[in-house]
Amino acid sequence: MEAYQNAALSPEERAKDLLGKMTLQEKVGQLNQRLYGFRIYERQGEEFTLTEEFKEEVERMGGLGVLYGLYRADPWADKDEKTGIVLELSAKAYNIVQKYVIDHSRLGIPMMMSTECPHGHQALGGGLLPVNLAAGATFDPELLSEGYKACGKQLKSGHVDLALMSASIWRATRDGEEVRSANSEEPVPCRIHG
């Protein structure tokens, strides 16, 4: 067993050993998050086939650091209930993708999962909350906390490591669309919701 695989060692010791074994290309590959997850598979019923685009990216980078948007399903992703990953198949899809990455990484490094979560889990069957501006207008942090916890459970069950959300607070009305990313453009709801 390599030192980086030994759970008895400290994270620092394991990371130092792993980084010492990695090539520059593998290190760059771990920083890579350019591949759209919804483009790496084709679904037929309950079966998934990985695309050549995905396989070539894993080969070229010596692994894959972060995969963005595997569960995303909307018109932009061109995925729906028949072609996308429904909740019942999410673990199966994740395991197929993760196994491929580990098996095709010289050092067996797993990937991290990243997804959009501006106001809930953007996936088929994912729970959504009101956009942040509307959530701020509830003036009810406990209710929102319950909703955020439910979203967190969904993300965790999908093995999502990084949920991308909007947390900026804008005051200028000229920002238009961007103001919906914050809990409010006013200080009181921002203070209430932290």
Could you say what each language-model-derived stretch is?
Residues 1-194:
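Glycoside hydrolase catalytic-domain context in secreted enzymes
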